[in-house]
Amino acid sequence: MVLDNIRNFSIIAHIDHGKSTLADRLLEYTGALTEREMQNQVLDKMDLERERGITIKAQAVRLNYQANDGRQYILNLIDTPGHVDFTYEVSRSLSACEGALLVVDASQGVEAQTLANVYLALENDLDVFPVLNKIDLPAAEPERVKQEIEDIIGLDAHDAVLASAKEGIGTREILEEIVNKIPPPRGDAAKPLKALLFDSWYDQYQGVIVLVRILDGSVKKGDKIQLMSNRRNYEVLKVGVFSPAMCEVASLSAGEVGFIIGGIKDVQDAKVGDTITNLHNPCDAPLSGFKEVQPMVFSGLYPIDTSQYEQLRDALAKLKLNDSSFSYEPETSLALGFGFRCGFLGLLHMEIIQERLEREFNLDLITTAPTVVYKVHRLDGSIITIESANQLPPTQEIEFVEEPFILASIHVPNEFVGGILALCEEKRGVQREIKYLTPTRVMIVYELPLNEVVLDFYDRLKSITKGYASLDYEHLDYRRSNLERLNIMINGEVVDALSLIIHKEKAYYRGRDLVSKMKELIPRQMFEIAIQAAIGNKVIARETVKALRKDVLAKCYGGDITRKRKLLEKQKEGKKRMKNVGNVELPQEAFLAILKVEG
């Protein structure tokens, strides 16, 4: 294949700006799919991707296109995940391309997520050109949005393609732009094999399928390959391309994008960003930029019905096959029984995994409040990392605790600025800058503790701005903070599942809210129940659930007071004994409500 006739490109867009629909039109136009095979969002294979309108895994599709200059081109569309949690995957997918289409909704303009991914594309030296989508909408303002693209991103947008993926307007113009504006790949097929692995997933019949962009050299069936990060060796069983169905080809050479199947059993071995080379004729150095993705948010998942524990374990193992950035380990809780502590890249990642467990595997789950990774500096000089309140050592052993901070950039219409600033201040944020991108849109940049963001920040951000805010964040560093463990006690017993790590200033208010919420939810028993919030040995808030009382004097009718007193004393004794041995059953709602108490 002549390198000059290949174009590798991806599509950058904010959620819901029409990326997957545009990809469908390109597939349809180039004849990759017949009318009969067309379905909406062909590349989003998971139901969940279609429903939420987001792309979770990367896909790569080869399109054959006869251009206006009469030449036949191969266009490789590499579809990238578009959400903030998957930034590393996006950057790897982008580095497999030479150019990108920036798709912007002509009625909404530039959003935070678009901005983050455009900067990633420019860092990877991609040629980016804008496409205004949804121009068929009555609210479309192409001229205003062109100006926004020039002002905010600094891209020349005067000749941006006007398109409507839904109506099929502008599809040929976009394909011509791809051919004319995106440079062909560079590479040398005679050099030793060097390929970038930019996605992998597990297929139950063929093992792990890896998506690669060949930079130098070539690969064919029967070759011995090596993954350079872990020095694992495999024999190539199949090479091929997606168009969009899997098609086997004789070989893949420099500049091309396709898949390799090599009998790899575990997705853990095929990490995104790794370099693949030939075992007997290796390239001199791996590609730069590879890193192990670390989970940032942790949460406990427990089956509501304990008999589903085995099913949950199998389901997690299956999800792990396709998602190497997700981690889990068994944990037990006195209150919730057996479950798993799971690690996620971020909030959206967590929601997606939970939703897939419930939907694809029919599991009913309780999720404990999400936590982040803290660094605890002990007095003996050692540093430990913890991801749940129950792992925090006693106060007398701790010198100080550090928590992770993020840099959040929030794009909002200017009428909501006051509410957003108040929210960020309440979440212990440090203001970096406020920038008016246009007379009506503002970018607010804050440094925020991740611990404050994981609970309900995103929901409140959306409700303050009526859904118009968009948020993007990147991890900054760890900072020393005044953090403590808040325990909830019921009749003097600590309920481990409800413990949390919280900032000292907020501990009293949070404790008070929690105990009053629990008071409403715990059913009354025959004895009174004390609900307390405590830091260390100091109780900071208390509520009491009053006892139910049986009228033991009903049968007495008048008569001697000593008889009544005897019965009352007996009742009192019984209640006392009951309180000592009685167990308080915490209803499921109590746990769920605790997660919903405003942080």
From Swiss-Prot:
It is found in: Cell inner membrane. Gene3D superfamilies: 3.30.70.240, Elongation factor 4, C-terminal domain, Elongation Factor G (Translational Gtpase), domain 3, P-loop containing nucleotide triphosphate hydrolases, Translation factors. GO terms for cellular component: plasma membrane. Its main location: membrane. GTP binds at residues 16-21, 133-136. One of its GO terms (biological process) is positive regulation of translation. Its EC number is 3.6.5.n1. It catalyses: GTP + H2O = GDP + phosphate + H(+). GO terms for molecular function: GTP binding; GTPase activity; ribosome binding; translation elongation factor activity. It is a peripheral membrane protein. Keywords: Cell inner membrane, Cell membrane, GTP-binding, Hydrolase, Membrane, Nucleotide-binding, Protein biosynthesis. It comes from the Bacteria. Pfam families: EFG_C, GTP_EFTU, GTP_EFTU_D2, LepA_C. Residues 4-186 form the tr-type G domain. Belongs to the TRAFAC class translation factor GTPase superfamily. Classic translation factor GTPase family. LepA subfamily. NCBIfam families: lepA (TIGR01393), small_GTP (TIGR00231). Required for accurate and efficient protein synthesis under certain stress conditions. May act as a fidelity factor of the translation reaction, by catalyzing a one-codon backward translocation of tRNAs on improperly translocated ribosomes. Back-translocation proceeds from a post-translocation (POST) complex to a pre-translocation (PRE) complex, thus giving elongation factor G a second chance to translocate the tRNAs correctly. Binds to ribosomes in a GTP-dependent manner. This is Elongation factor 4. The lineage of its organism: Bacteria, Pseudomonadati, Thermodesulfobacteriota, Desulfuromonadia, Geobacterales. The gene is lepA.
